[in-house]
Amino acid sequence: MDAIKKKMQAMKVDKDGALERALVCEQEARDANTRAEKAEEEARQLQKKIQTVENELDQTQEALTLVTGKLEEKNKALQNAESEVAALNRRIQLLEEDLERSEERLGSATAKLSEASQAADESERARKILENRALADEERMDALENQLKEARFLAEEADKKYDEVARKLAMVEADLERAEERAEQGENKIVELEEELRVVGNNLKSLEVSEEKANQREEEYKNQIKTLNTRLKEAEARAEFAERSVQKLQKEVDRLEDDLIVEKERYCMIGDSLDEAFVDLIKGLEPFWNPRNPKPPTPKLPTPTPEELAAMEEARAAAEAAAAAEAEAAEAAAAAGEAGPDGAPAAPGEEKAPAKEPTPPKEPTPPPPPPPPFEYSIDLPPEGAEVPYVKNYEPPPPGSEPEPVPAAEGEAAPAAEGAAPPAEGAAPPAEGAVPPADGAAPPAEGAAPAAEGAAPPADGAAPPAEAAAAPADAAAPAAEAAPAEAPAAEATAAEAPPAEAAPAEAAPAAAEGEAPPA
């Protein structure tokens, strides 16, 4: 009922506010009308001035346009005010409908209240009926007492009659005996009546005791109701306090959970920084890849075109021709070495030291991609961990050792592994022979390394000319499509001993043939 009254009061307040706003809007509309009338009067005055003053025609026209614009604005404002008034009227109607609904609810609530009062009246009537029954029982007890008195009086009268009859029938023994028997029967009846009277008295006493007990129970029940009401109020107060404490604890738990998430994120960032520090401090340690810092994908080499394949075949044929020419030169040098001790020494400059194969350049490591988004299930350490999680060092797999650093300029590169030794009887290099690959340029630092699965260069392949510098950009190994042809090149090149330098023109051709496809 209080909520309904509050709602009705709030609705009345809204209604009064709406009516006040409607009155304010009407007053604004009236003000706008008065202003419009004033503007019309000003326009008339301006027209008179225009007629009288022709020189100020332009100024008055501009003022007229301004006044007409203001008039239109006022008309628009008036229309808006009318629309607002209509909206407020609709709102008032809705509020009246809500008021009617609330009145209906109030009527239903009053009906329920009347039903409850009727039920209370019925219970009160039942209590009065029980009291009336108790009074009727008391009246019955009084009537029984009166009947008992009458029975005693009748018994006394019977005794008197018995005495009279005994005196009259004293002479007749049979009558006397009968009278005695009757007297005995009367005495028995008197005893029975006395016993009944005692039973009735006991019942009356028990009823009085039960009535007293009932009164005591009623008082006890009232006291229990009062105590239960007080306990109920205390329990409600405790429940409200418990709800408030639970809300406070829930807020504290939410705050602690947020702090825990922030600390876990900071812990993961510290772990990543520690991993990066370990990678920077320990040389040869592979970086720690994780979902935040994934491993970059291996770049794929493009598939060579038919034109590039044809160029590679031509370069391979030119390399084989150069190897055959070097083999012939080696045979000629061997023959000249055999003839040298007999009195025909080899001319200086005929033989040269075998050129050493240049090392392939390294491929630059691409920069790592940006880390992925943070994931608690992956990035956080296992539960119960007391120390930071650091990945143990794993040695690199066999075959992935770093390549040796190429020799500096002016120094000879080490001989290729598996290179064919000089033929027996070959003359040592002459004193005036040019050192091998003195002017050869070292491989560029940014050159790409050999692709996975690509065939390595032939161990015994013929070196390029001593005077020709190997181009750094074309010094990459062959593509992935040439693994089948590598054994044949190794077999042919292993048979050829080191010989004199091939013509300078063969070196660029061989280098172009070994270059990977663009």
Swiss-Prot record:
Biased composition annotated in UniProt, kind: Pro residues: 293-305, 357-374, 394-405
GO biological process, one term: response to hyperoxia
Entry coiled-coil feature ranges: 14-267
Domain of life where this protein originates: Eukaryota
Locations listed in the record: Cytoplasm, Cytoskeleton
Keywords: Actin-binding, Coiled coil, Cytoplasm, Cytoskeleton, Muscle protein
Region (Disordered): 101-125, 288-518
Tissue-specificity statement: Both isoforms are only expressed in indirect flight muscles.
Cellular component GO terms held in the UniProt record: actin filament; cytosol; investment cone; P granule; sarcomere
GO molecular function: actin binding; actin filament binding; kinesin binding
Biased amino acid composition, Low complexity: 318-348, 406-518
Similarity remark: Belongs to the tropomyosin family.
Function: Tropomyosin, in association with the troponin complex, plays a central role in the calcium dependent regulation of muscle contraction.
Assembly behavior: Homodimer.
Domain notes: The molecule is in a coiled coil structure that is formed by 2 polypeptide chains. The sequence exhibits a prominent seven-residues periodicity.
Protein name: Tropomyosin-1, isoforms 33/34
Organism name: Drosophila melanogaster (Fruit fly)
